[in-house]
Regions:
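Active-site SXXK
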Residues: 42-49
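A common structural junction motif
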Residues: 110-121, 219-229
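An aromatic/glycine/proline-enriched structural segment found at the starts
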Residues: 167, 171-177, 192-250
Length: 250
């Protein structure tokens, strides 16, 4: 896979993957994890996945994806060491398999860029109704974590081991902070992400011309943003300490 720098803090990785019948366009936003914004960043992908400016609700978005032969849009977040990684990804069949010769890759590009750079806003902020719904979903996920003892123990061990260091930030969010999140707060962390994140554009299953068109479309979006990418935090090693045994009861 070829990886090239296409703008400050922006890389393109591509592979034509000619043996497969599907393609994928993924936009990764990577930035240092911070304790004060961890819960907002955990909620952000849940709200972004519900739709964007041209498809402001899940019904319209589902219909649009269905017309593209069952394409799939996902917006998720995952830890990346001491950094946070939010990914917007669209997957679907290649143009060559479209029954009527539709330019599917161009449509996938519009959806990916729409979800990443043109969210559905109400009075300049994320839709309050969508934020309220996804706050409940995030709360439920955090409350249910304790019922999965293996995952809970892994997360707790990670928090105890790394403590207050950047690697110890609970990137899935903090239950006690969810209720306090507002659409304005979520919009602020979203805009900060656009300004400061390192961006990885991953294009799989597209030819050179399609890849160039996707690259140019992304660069056009970034040209409208006053970008100042932050350096990512390197993986860290904690000092050796004596073993500690922790017991929790409920």
């Amino acid at each position: 896979m070829e990886r090239t720098l296409i703008a400050p803090g922006v890389h393109l990785s591509c592979d034509p993957a000619s043996k497969f019948n599907r393609c994928r366009i993924s936009i990764h936003f990577a930035f240092p994890a911070q304790r004060k914004t961890a819960t907002a960043h955990a909620l952000l992908p849940l709200v972004m996945e519900r739709g964007y400016a041209d498809c402001p609700d899940m019904t319209r978005l589902t219909k649009k994806l269905a017309k593209l032969y069952g394409a799939d849009l996902t917006v998720d977040a995952r830890p990346m060491g001491c950094n946070h990684n939010l990914c917007v990804s669209v997957t679907g069949i290649k143009d060559a398999f479209a029954l009527e010769g539709e330019a599917l890759t161009a449509e996938y590009t519009k959806i990916a860029l729409g979800a990443a750079f043109h969210p559905y806003l109400v009075d300049g902020c994320f839709d309050p109704q969508a934020v309220s719904i996804e706050k409940q979903m995030l709360k439920k996920g955090l409350e249910d974590e304790i019922n999965d003892k293996r995952i809970y123990c892994l997360h707790q061990a990670n928090r105890e081991f790394f403590g207050d260091s950047p690697a110890g930030v609970r990137q899935e969010g903090y239950l006690e902070e969810v209720d306090g999140l507002t659409p304005a707060m979520l919009t602020d962390v979203y805009r900060q992400m656009l300004r400061t994140a390192n961006i990885e554009l991953l294009v799989l299953g597209c030819d050179a011309a399609q890849t160039a068109a996707i690259r140019d479309a992304l660069l056009a979006e970034l040209a409208r943003i006053d970008r100042a990418p932050l350096p990512l935090v390197e993986n860290m090693a904690m000092p050796a300490i004596a073993p500690v045994h922790k017991t929790e009861t409920y």
